[in-house]
């Protein structure tokens, strides 16, 4: 994720799965006795790659990991999350990734105007057009959790399908 993991509700997942790093690194917040709900422990076993606020880097990484089958004959299932309104910050890399037939899932959350109190830049009223217009990107906007479950199941199969592609899911 290239954005604030707490406000995108990734905190508990990160705490369970850990942060990826090539070497073990202790939690600097804990070491300095700074209160935090997050466990910022990095290790080679971690499954979350923290990118800071860098949407372009997210799409470059998703595109690269999404080409693993072509490059190494081993399919990965890269999933990225981003503030939905910030999808546009990485459109060049998203466009190239889709045209190269990279396979990944991008989740834009929260979508719509739910972040309106944070200002106009946080309202994602134009991003549905990205999902609709980008070749190689299938777009969904589920309203209920049971829909999301079915969409994710379909998406993992779609990523592996010879005629498949990448998937964009907008969540509110």
Residue spans for each PLM region:
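Thiamine diphosphate
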Residues: 1-172
């Amino acid at each position: 994720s290239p954005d604030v993991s707490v406000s995108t509700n990734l905190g508990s997942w990160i705490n369970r799965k850990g942060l990826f790093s090539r070497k073990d690194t202790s939690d600097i917040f804990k070491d300095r006795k700074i209160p935090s709900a997050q466990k910022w422990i990095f290790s080679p076993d971690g499954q979350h790659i923290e990118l800071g606020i860098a949407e372009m880097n997210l799409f470059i990484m998703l595109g690269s990991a999404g080409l693993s089958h072509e490059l190494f004959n081993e399919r990965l299932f890269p999933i990225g999350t981003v503030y939905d309104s910030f999808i546009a910050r990485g459109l060049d890399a998203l466009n190239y990734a889709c045209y190269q037939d990279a396979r990944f899932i991008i989740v834009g959350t929260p979508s719509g105007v739910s972040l309106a109190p944070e200002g106009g830049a946080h309202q994602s009223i134009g991003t549905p057009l990205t999902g609709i217009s980008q070749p190689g990107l299938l777009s969904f906007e589920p309203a209920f959790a049971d829909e999301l479950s079915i969409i994710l199941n379909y998406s993992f199969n779609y990523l592996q399908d010879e005629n498949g592609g990448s998937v964009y899911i907008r969540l509110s």
